[in-house]
């Protein structure tokens, strides 16, 4: 069968079907405007460019159970949203994209996914633009983005504002509870030219050997038209809850980063201030808050604006790391080879501004009897 577009006031129920498209822009299932699609136990394959597997835009609503989706073109996310946003709730299923620039999930809507396999074989795993949200529950997420000279770096999940007009400017949200992330190339999380909230809870992460960072929160070189050079940083609230992490956290002075480690979280890495894309600089910061029972294992000299530590900070050999103020004050004298340089330091941790991951039950939709 062909693509199924749904427009104003329309409702469609799709069950035990096969949907295939072989034309540019041929989405599998498409909900638009006041339209709603309910779909279950269906195979969807798209072959050409700009052909999402399941697609919502203009406020459309799409609810899916146990679909098997594969896309093969460029700009063809398996779960795709577009200008005007909408709502997508996915429960179970397998979603695979094979093209360049085709993430498993392209998010310019409010999307929640539970117990699904999400794989991008030729792209980053997730793109989130602007005032939109993606919440993943007990799902397995894989990305394999190729290096590109137009980009400052390579990533697995990006939260950004492209300035294309496809999404309203505002805070991007990424939450993940359980499940796995597999990064086959590049760093893990990259955020630029936006405001965002990232929260991870007990996610099992597999890194590639060339991973350059765990989180990069910086401006960009504007080769892609993402904001104004020297003023296109990111304001990011990052929370790790019962989360093991590995890799550097990179930030710059045109970005604001609040980094919270809670409930026994661990980080093996360094905090690196990199002004490469910060122009003349700004008043940005990197504030790190480490709760009791959380641990930072330092792997290199680090620079932080404010460090609030009620947990444990050592190097990989268990040696105490020196914590020194930019004014020369020694807050902690250690025997490690590494030093943490801070603007301010305290040995307590206020995590009241951290993010609590929402429950799947807040987004779960009852499957219609007709499906």
Language model feature labels by segment:
Residues 1-4:
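Short, small-residue-biased leader/transition segments that mark boundaries at the very start
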Residues 10-75, 79-81:
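A generic tandem-repeat structural signature
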Residues 11-16, 36-42, 61-67, 87-92, ...:
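All-beta strand scaffolds that present successive hydrophobic residues in beta-strands
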Residues 21-24, 46-49, 71-74, 97-100, ...:
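Surface-exposed loop/turn segments connecting beta-strands in extracellular beta-rich domains
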Residues 52-177, 182-183, 188-189:
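Solenoidal tandem-repeat scaffolds enriched in leucines and small polar residues
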Residues 118, 130-134, 141-142, 146-150, ...:
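Intrinsically disordered, low-complexity terminal regions
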Residues 160-161, 165-178, 183-202, 206-228:
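Long, acidic/serine-threonine-rich intrinsically disordered regions with weak helical/coil propensity
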Residues 252, 256-370:
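Extracellular beta-strand/loop-rich repeat segments of large surface/secreted proteins
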């Amino acid at each position: 069968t062909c693509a199924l577009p749904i427009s104003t006031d329309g409702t469609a129920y799709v069950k035990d079907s096969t949907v295939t498209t072989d034309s540019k822009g041929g989405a599998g299932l498409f909900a638009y405007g006041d339209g709603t699609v309910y779909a279950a136990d269906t195979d969807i394959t798209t072959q050409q460019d700009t052909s999402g597997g399941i697609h919502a835009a203009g406020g459309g609503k799409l609810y899916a159970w146990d679909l098997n989706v594969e896309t093969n073109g460029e700009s063809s996310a398996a779960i795709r949203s577009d200008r005007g946003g909408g709502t997508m709730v996915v429960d179970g299923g397998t979603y695979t994209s094979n093209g360049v620039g085709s993430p498993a999930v392209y998010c310019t809507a409010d999307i929640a996914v539970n117990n699904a396999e999400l794989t991008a074989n030729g792209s980053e795993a997730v793109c989130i633009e602007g005032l939109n949200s993606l919440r993943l529950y007990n799902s397995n997420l894989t990305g394999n983005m190729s290096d590109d000279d137009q980009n400052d770096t390579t990533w697995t999940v990006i939260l950004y504002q492209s300035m294309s007009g496809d999404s309203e400017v505002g805070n991007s949200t990424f939450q993940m509870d359980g499940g796995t992330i597999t990064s086959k190339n590049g760093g893990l999380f990259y955020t630029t030219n936006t405001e965002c909230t990232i929260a991870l809870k007990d996610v099992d992460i597999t890194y590639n050997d060339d991973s350059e960072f765990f989180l990069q929160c910086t401006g960009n070189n504007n080769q892609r038209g993402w904001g104004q050079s020297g003023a296109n940083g990111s304001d990011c609230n990052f929370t790790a809850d019962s989360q093991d992490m590995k890799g550097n956290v990179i930030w710059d002075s045109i970005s604001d980063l609040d980094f919270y480690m809670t409930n026994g979280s661990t980080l093996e890495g360094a905090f690196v201030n990199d002004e490469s894309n910060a122009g003349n600089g700004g008043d940005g910061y990197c504030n790190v808050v480490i709760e009791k029972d959380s641990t930072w294992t330092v792997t290199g000299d680090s620079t932080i604006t404010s460090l609030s530590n009620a947990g444990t900070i050592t190097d990989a050999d268990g040696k105490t790391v020196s914590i020194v103020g930019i004014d020369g004050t020694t807050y902690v004298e250690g025997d490690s080879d590494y030093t943490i340089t801070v603007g301010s330091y305290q040995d307590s941790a206020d995590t009241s501004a951290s993010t609590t991951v929402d429950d799947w039950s807040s987004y779960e939709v009852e499957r219609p009897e007709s499906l």
